[in-house]
Amino acid sequence: MNQIEQKWQYIWQEEKAFEVSNASSKPKYYVLEMLPYPSGKIHVGHVRNYSIGDVIARFMTMQGFNVLHPMGWDAFGLPAENAAIKNNSHPKKWTYSNIKNMKKQLKSMGFSYDWSREINSCDPEYYKHEQKFFLELYERNLAYQKASFVNWDPVDNTVLANEQVVDGRGWRSGAIVAKRYLKQWFLKITDYAEELLNEIQNLKEWPEAVRSMQEKWIGKSIGANFHFKIKDNEETTIEVFSTKPETIFGASFIGIAFNHPIIERLVSKTPEILAFITQCSHITRSSELEKAEKEGVFTGLFVTHPFDSNIVLPVIITNFVLMDYGTGAIFGCPAHDECDHELAVKMNLSIKQVIKADMDVQKTAYTEDGILINSDVLNGLTSNEAKQEVIGEFEKLGIGKRSVNYRLKDWGISRQRFWGCPIPMIHCEICGIVPVPYKDLPVTLPDDVNFDGHGNPLDHHPSWKHVNCPKCDKPAVRETDTFDTFFESSWYFTRYCNSNATEMTDKKACDYWLPVDKYIGGIEHAVMHLLYARFFTKVMNEQNYVSVREPFKGLFTQGMVLHATYKDEHNNWLYPEEVVKKGNEFFHKESNNRVVQGRIEKMSKSKKNLIDLETMQEQYGADAIRLFVLSDSPPEKDLEWSASGIEGCSRFINKLEYMFKAIDSLKDDVNSEVNKELNRLVHFTIKHVAEDIKHFALNRAIARMRELSNAISAEISKDKIDVKIVRHGFNVLVQLLNPFIPHITEEIWQKLGNKERLYNLSFPAFDESMLELDTYIMAVQVNGKLRDTYEFKTSVSEDEIKQVTVSLPKVQKCLEGKEPKKIILVPRKIVNILV
């Protein structure tokens, strides 16, 4: 099998089978899988992702489209730097070696990529364009530097964006993330929050789950900003944001973030307060607040109520208010907010009901809208009426105004790492921040770097960062932070349109290919890569690089590949190939000691539940692997890897070769019986496989092709064979299977005597009239109860149906000699005889 696969891979390469032109009279179709990080090896999860994309690309080519199906490398990132530290070598060497190996693996799987458009994000010829783009953003005030609290990963020694912190830990290292106050570069994604939110409704070919995740991440809140005066210091105020300002008369405390500026200015930092601030610094995302037990510590400060100066409220540092949401301060209304209620119970704060409810708010918060009570002039108003009234009063008093808030924050793009795209800025003591002139781009990374595992090597390099200021020509220093690697992947899909363009994009080529018609990747990128790419596309549109404002018309999120985990008697993880099954138990191959099978989980290096792709290819071939990852589960669901599953796929491919030999030896027989049912199944399969592929029901398409294969096999085994339909059916089967298992189908197609390559052929056509059955079965009911069934010819009349069904013995028994009162027909389905 490997020889056949290598043969066809060589032919495709020599014939430039999958290279496409930007100038074609055909309609375009752009299918793209998320580009991989060159970690060293392609894993089975990659193969599933890329196999899905390859089926779609090959199918759309067969449908007459000019299909762009490119591949490249998201090549900057921490693993390369960690490998450099470990091996004392440059990350570039490690990265390029991995790319070479992974490209070879991808080609060995037979994916139909246009390799002439390959991109590599760590190539200066690629990243020089994003450096220029960053400078353009800076000129438009869409890029800026400021000091802020950031998420610090103590293991990777770098800053993480909010989206890269999962359950309080770094998304890559797993380390507990802390807060640090550092100067960082940001992009003003918040300027586009409203458009990013509004356009979600137009992404009709995206999964609802992803659209919902983006909506929640952007998190639009409509309410009011207003001020509370600090008691005994009325010139100082605390500004709060609230989505329910109408509950102001139920306020019992002011909650502030642990890093609110007022703490530094006015709060005496007792050991209790300092300990609490340290504890809070580990909470980095609002999603974590929902899980955390609500806690607080009193600051010693009080504020006065804006509508009644006799009411004073304590100011409390809480662990559920974040500085980067709203103003970093809220007023707590325990009767009508669950977080506030939990804290009030814990700290013995008052719980005052201000919305009418048929429940005890001392026990549980009532969070719905309703009629206002205990609220002075707001009594009797609905929640919405009271909201408008109270905001109007804030505006009259000059203490507040209506406001819209977003959970989305500006994107922090600074990373304190070496292996990333250098940020093209210079710091001058005289001129301040100075952009690198366009003519001096790209700013490249030095080759002579010392990796000792401590901080950013660019900071310690003896010469790289020392330059003269472009403005005053005095000594200055380069910015040593590099871009977040999501910067590169936020625009790469535009580069494929013409990877040799002298500018960031070839606009004419982008106008032809964009938007991407189908983008395929994991749902874990819903609020990072996918949101950033949407943001970049909007800005690139404004910079005249592209004409579209949304990058991806359709999105498909595939499931993960899972495998059982195994541990030995010492609790050490084992690779699957180290384990053998005997009966219902598992044993270590070498020691024969009993092995414990654990949960079926996502494949990971740490738990060793990995499958070595090269070993699988040697044993079964690329086609069998492709078929298995597509056939055993719907593509959007998780797939459990199983040895029996891939063995079954290998047997199916071998069966195709046996079928070819059997059919090739058949002689035309004028006495053979015409098999109308097989002919109908051929046309039925063509129609429904096409529909299944269009709807990404690839496992169902494979099941239909297996059914056709079985029907053809059954016909071959008969004494009198319909040779004509068997040959036609097998030809069709080979064509239908080609997008899934391209190597063996091209081989069989050639052996069948065909000169044209399968990759150049159109998808088989079906005849609608051939789908009609000669007969159909109807359910026969008496007074709505099923009594019998009967098979009718398609030519039968309604009167004949009535006569036949009434005369059926089971019906006659129910009639007991009576005449039917009425007979109701549901065409080709039901006859209901009423007595």
From Swiss-Prot:
Its main location: cytoplasm. It holds the Pfam family Anticodon_1. GO terms for molecular function: aminoacyl-tRNA deacylase activity; ATP binding; leucine-tRNA ligase activity. GO terms for biological process: leucyl-tRNA aminoacylation. Belongs to the class-I aminoacyl-tRNA synthetase family. PANTHER family: LEUCINE--TRNA LIGASE, MITOCHONDRIAL (PTHR43740:SF2), LEUCYL-TRNA SYNTHETASE (PTHR43740). This is Leucine--tRNA ligase. It comes from Rickettsia peacockii (strain Rustic).
